[in-house]
Amino acid sequence: NKVMQVIREEMNRAGGQELTLTSLQDRELWEKADRWDDNKVDIWFKTKLKNETELGLAWSHEEPITKLMVQHISSYRDLPVLAYQFQTKFRNETRAKSGIMRTREFIMKDLYSFARTQAEHEEVYASIRKAYVQVFERVGLGQVTYPGFAWGGVFSKCSAGF
């Protein structure tokens, strides 16, 4: 679609690399991060394979992308890395949040960055915010789009929404 193409062009211009991660995620990876237990993160859709292996449908990709980067970044010279994807997310939402209806399945574009230093991280973050402003300008929403804070239990202080 045209909007996704504009986003893709601006993310690439900012140094992003597009990838696609699996929607089926291993229990072990999320247990290691202490985010598999429903008492900690209660939005998982979980299933079992015939061999009893437990999997979850992706509600986020922090753990899988971190595992991938650990395997492929071999030197600080490889940094910064900005990886993004357009991915179907699945969240077992129980109610609307912040006045906006939350759905159980949606397509989201997310970007993950890996930097050498906090200063470099902040530079990357600023460049991506500028890229989003450019996206909104290009699609004709620049005058009516305002940055907001992506507040929530699983998001870090360096998350933003528009």
Feature names for model-found ranges:
Residues 1-162:
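TRNA-recognition modules of translation machinery and tRNA-sensing kinases, especially anticodon-binding
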